[in-house]
Regions:
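Long, low-complexity, Lys/Arg-enriched
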Residues: 1-117, 138-438
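Elongated alpha-helical scaffolds
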Residues: 119-135, 400
Length: 438
């Protein structure tokens, strides 16, 4: 029994499960190339084969009455169902030792094919088999690109005393929650959103939502908000990987993430309570981008935090590029020059690197008012202090690291190739700068 579904009267959960999955209507024997598409695999210990499987079984001893009674083995029951696909049996050991456990693992794994869709029933299994199936499922997802579509358990102990009907429990949502957890961890640790996007595109929340039995409107809202949240995370990651300075400094994608986070958390509290903590964990990994610091405007803070985020996620070229450009933008804003005008930006950068105002850095067609303003500002305590703090690092970041990266260490005069020690130095500089603004 599952929701509105009730199987034929049967002693075998396998029959009930196959009826629930509508195997007779939806599964096939062969594809257009004559290859076997769908299969039913029954795992049999020697004892199970002898006592419950063989079609030659016609009677068995009733342990309660101690009398022999009519009995039909599962093999005959499945034959009578006239299933459209082959039924295969695989012998497995009793699973009484660690060695036998690994034998079962390997036997089941070898039976799987590339890109298989798996439907498991765990009812008559060893106590550790549910854990084995969870591990095996993830193992086969990685190595054979399989998809786990169904995991069920016939809970005979919870049967109705009057009707003798037992519930068929769908435990796939537990594995789906595991998938969402792993995908979120991959995003937080590696900056990789691919797994989250795949779950979104494959409607991987459907089993979870269906199991919770919530209103359709709640489901649609939750799914819609989650889709928007994942899209906003993807936009943020694209900004990092593609060094989209204007988006990073404006905080547009961070604000999108913040808005979507509030919506999706509220929606999922109503339908799947375990999801919001996963989302909150993602949100906490981006908390350093949220700032009201008065000395450093939020845009500049986000630039430095973006450099650190990229470094932490091993996007070193993006880290040094964003850091280099953000230092220049920071200096332009302090100096009063327009960071969006190439000549003013370049000349301001030269002032930072040389530490003094040089007339030759400011071309003749540069606005006189800008040049005069810079000459005055260059002597101010704020500018001199910024130069003192940043000059050495800024020169190394641009010449000693970024140029080597951008030119693949192929250009002469860049003092050799980029080394792991250079990357470590970059990390120390980023931490030092970020530490000053936090």
């Amino acid at each position: 029994m599952k929701g509105s579904f009730t199987s034929s009267e049967t002693r075998f959960i396998q029959q009930a499960t196959l009826e629930y999955l509508k195997v007779r209507n939806n599964w096939t024997t062969q594809n257009a190339d004559g290859e076997v598409v769908d299969r039913i695999i029954i795992l049999l210990t020697d004892g199970a084969k002898k006592d419950n499987w063989s079609k030659d079984i016609t009677t068995r001893m009733n342990r309660k009455t101690n009398q022999e009674e009519s009995y039909q083995g599962l093999e005959q029951v499945l034959n009578d169902m006239e299933l459209p696909c082959p039924v295969e049996t695989i012998s497995i050991p009793d699973g009484k030792s660690e060695e036998e456990m690994w034998t079962i693992f390997n036997v089941v794994y070898e039976a799987l094919r590339i890109n298989d869709e798996l439907y498991f029933d765990l009812t008559h299994s060893f106590r550790y088999l549910p854990m084995l199936v969870l591990v095996l499922g993830n193992y086969a997802k990685f190595l054979k690109n399989v998809t786990v579509k169904h995991i069920s358990y016939g809970n005979y102990e919870a049967r109705d005393a009057n009707t003798n009907e037992a519930p068929l429990m769908d435990i796939l949502p537990l594995t789906m929650l595991q998938d969402w957890t792993f995908a979120a961890a991959d995003l937080i640790q590696n900056g990789n959103i691919k797994k989250l996007q795949e779950l979104k595109e494959n409607n991987a929340l459907v089993p979870l939502l269906r199991e919770r039995g919530k209103k359709n409107i709640d489901r649609r809202l939750a799914e819609g908000y989650l889709d928007a949240y994942i899209d906003s995370l993807r936009n943020f990651l694209n900004d990092m990987k593609l060094c989209q300075g204007p988006n990073i400094l404006s905080g547009v994608t961070i604000n999108q993430i913040r808005d979507c986070h509030e919506q999706v958390s509220e929606a999922f509290e109503k339908v799947i309570a375990p999801i919001p903590p996963i989302i909150s964990k993602i949100q906490k990994s981006l908390k350093d981008f949220e700032t009201t610091d008065t000395m450093y405007p939020e845009s500049l803070r986000n630039g430095y935090e973006a450099a650190k985020w990229c470094y932490d996620h091993q996007l070193y070229q993006q880290a040094v590029t964003i850091l280099d450009e953000n230092i220049t933008t920071d200096f332009c804003q302090r100096l009063g020059t327009d960071e969006h005008v190439y000549k003013e930006r370049t000349a301001s950068n030269a002032l930072l690197r040389w530490g003094v105002y040089r007339e030759e850095d400011w071309e003749a067609d540069t606005l006189e008012a800008v040049r005069e303003k810079v000459q005055v500002a260059a002597c101010s305590p704020d500018i001199l202090n910024f130069i003192r703090l940043m000059q050495k690092d800024a020169v190394w970041i641009h010449n000693g690291c970024r140029n080597k990266y951008n030119h693949a260490s192929m250009i002469q005069g860049t003092e050799g190739m980029l080394t792991p020690e250079d990357i470590e130095k970059l990390g120390r500089i980023i931490m030092r700068i970020v530490g000053r603004i936090r």
